[in-house]
Amino acid sequence: MSEAVFFVENAEELAKQKMDNINPELSEKFQLLIKFLSRFPESCSNPRSKQVRKNFGKAEHIEYLAQNFNESRLPKKPTPPTTIPDEVVSLVLNVSFDIPQENLNRIKEEHRLSMASENIVGDLLERYLAEKLEPCGWIWCSGTSVKAVDFIHYDNEKDEWGLLQVKNRDNTENSSSSKIRDNTPIKKWFRTFSQRDATNWENFPDEVSSKDLNEDDFRAFVESYLRKIK
């Protein structure tokens, strides 16, 4: 992180200007994100670019965040990994699990596709929740712009922030962060259990949404979304 861990005074104005040039439909949401990061700059994810890090909280950094915020909302297809598979895995399948030699190439390819599918489920979950929560005033922190937080909400009357972190499974690595600087708690929720065949929708935080969020609706969203971009 840059030594200057703060955002410039006109950060919200810059946020609107930058997003107006990229996608005006997201300007209000992005402004709210920058409002949050201006108050809690230590919660901002560390930019990959050294040049952007040098200009933390300034116009160049805000434009970088705006581009990521927008691009992460564009349709995203499952992409099989490009890594070369380890042939010893096939050997283990053949010897230890009695998988016939003629089936190994098919299994290898299906494993690649399965990995691609598994890797995108978390993104699909966030997109589904964004569709449900953003009309209620929550903002999807697309572009991994905020550490340990996926959705934020601002109560203007109380000047209070709501923070939500979502995970696809209960054994997915979670950030150890449970609060931000002013002791605002980060609500945490996961969708599925790793040790039993069950989902966790019934425990979605009531204070976040009163909408009927459930597994059937999520699966319908996933199927519709993937068919549109196929």
UniProtKB/Swiss-Prot annotation:
**GO terms classed as biological process:** DNA restriction-modification system
Highest taxon, organism lineage: Bacteria
Record-linked Pfam families: RE_SinI
Q: Which reaction does it catalyse?
A: Endonucleolytic cleavage of DNA to give specific double-stranded fragments with terminal 5'-phosphates
InterPro entries the record matches: Restrct_endonuc_II_SinI (IPR019070)
Q: Does the keyword Nuclease apply?
A: yes
Q: What is its EC number?
A: 3.1.21.4
- Keyword annotations: Endonuclease, Hydrolase, Nuclease, Restriction system
Molecular-function GO terms, alphabetical: DNA binding; type II site-specific deoxyribonuclease activity
Q: Does the keyword Hydrolase apply?
A: yes
The name this protein carries in UniProt is: Type II restriction enzyme SinI
